[in-house]
């Protein structure tokens, strides 16, 4: 990050880092505005655009949580996977998962990659290559690598990797009145209601994200 930040910009950047460390995902514009006393999310948006121009973050247009922290020392997004100083944690990269087989079965692991453990809220167990755009508005895009910590339980509202029948999907978990729903973050996709007769299991919770392609 070559350009010096203003005091307010640094406050916003610190808030983004703290939120990512706590939840695994960045805050919304409304959450930034509320936390820092802005009159509207538009004020937060102006500061975010300034941070993006200065190279501190990347923004995904149209996504409420589409904020990506940049790697220090102006490394490119793909350098998070290859830069020797950042490659302190080696994780299996899981591609497509075959029906009925364990997610970390050897045939699903495309390769192992080295990553900076400081990128994540909690230490992940594996990376999952994202397929599709159903979680776009959470800033999770096609081809991104979702950092996942294995877990059989999750809190309401967490983004999870779930197995439903023969499919593995990334969605936001919602439990309400004894019913489980898997919610997309894109209005083009419908929520998935888990029936009592469905084979359902949690494979893990999302603790961070790596973008391998630059935003356009």
UniProtKB/Swiss-Prot annotation:
Keyword Transferase attached = no
Kindly state which reaction or reactions the protein catalyses. Hydrolysis of Ala-|-Gly bond in repressor LexA
What EC number(s) has UniProt assigned to this enzyme? 3.4.21.88
For molecular function, the Gene Ontology terms on record are:
DNA binding; serine-type endopeptidase activity
Give the Pfam families listed for this entry.
Answer: LexA_DNA_bind, Peptidase_S24
> Where are the catalytic residues?
134 (for autocatalytic cleavage activity), 171 (for autocatalytic cleavage activity)
- DNA-binding region ranges: 29-49
Has UniProt tagged this entry with the keyword Plastid?
no
Matching InterPro entries: LexA, LexA-like, LexA/Signal_pep-like_sf, LexA_DNA-bd_dom, LexA_repressor, Peptidase_S24_LexA, Peptidase_S24_S26A/B/C, WH-like_DNA-bd_sf
What is the top-level taxon of the source organism?
A: Bacteria
Broad class of enzyme this protein falls into: hydrolase
Q: Name one GO biological process term.
A: negative regulation of DNA-templated transcription
Write down the position(s) of the site called Cleavage. Answer: 99-100
Q: Tell me the keywords, alphabetical order.
A: Autocatalytic cleavage, DNA damage, DNA repair, DNA replication, DNA-binding, Hydrolase, Repressor, SOS response, Transcription, Transcription regulation
Q: How does it assemble?
A: Homodimer.
| Family membership noted in the UniProt record | Belongs to the peptidase S24 family.
The family database entries (NCBIfam families) matched by this protein are listed as: lexA
What is the purpose of this protein? Represses a number of genes involved in the response to DNA damage (SOS response), including recA and lexA. In the presence of single-stranded DNA, RecA interacts with LexA causing an autocatalytic cleavage which disrupts the DNA-binding part of LexA, leading to derepression of the SOS regulon and eventually DNA repair.
UniProt-recorded name of the protein: LexA repressor
Q: What species was this sequence derived from? A: Bordetella pertussis (strain Tohama I / ATCC BAA-589 / NCTC 13251)
What is this organism's lineage?
A: Bacteria, Pseudomonadati, Pseudomonadota, Betaproteobacteria, Burkholderiales
Q: Which gene encodes it?
A: lexA
């Amino acid at each position: 990050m070559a350009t010096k930040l203003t005091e307010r910009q640094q406050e916003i950047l610190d808030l983004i880092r703290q939120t990512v460390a706590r939840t695994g995902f960045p805050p919304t514009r409304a959450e930034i505005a509320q936390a820092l006393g802005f009159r509207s999310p538009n004020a937060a948006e102006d500061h975010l655009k300034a941070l993006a121009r200065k190279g501190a973050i990347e923004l995904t247009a149209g996504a409420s949580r589409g904020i990506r922290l940049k790697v220090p020392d102006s490394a490119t997004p793909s350098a998070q996977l290859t830069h020797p100083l950042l490659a302190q944690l080696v994780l299996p990269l899981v591609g497509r998962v075959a029906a009925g087989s364990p997610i970390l079965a050897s045939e699903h692991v495309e390769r192992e990659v080295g990553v900076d453990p400081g990128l994540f809220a909690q230490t992940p167990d594996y990376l999952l290559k994202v397929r599709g755009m159903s979680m776009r508005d959470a800033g999770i895009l096609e081809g991104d690598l979702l950092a996942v910590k294995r877990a059989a339980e999750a809190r309401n509202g967490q983004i999870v990797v779930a197995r439903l029948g023969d499919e593995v999907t990334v969605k936001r978990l919602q439990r309400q009145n004894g019913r489980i729903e898997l919610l997309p973050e894109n209005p083009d996709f419908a929520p998935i209601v888990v029936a009592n007769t469905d084979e359902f299991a949690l494979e893990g919770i999302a603790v961070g994200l790596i973008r391998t392609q630059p935003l356009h």
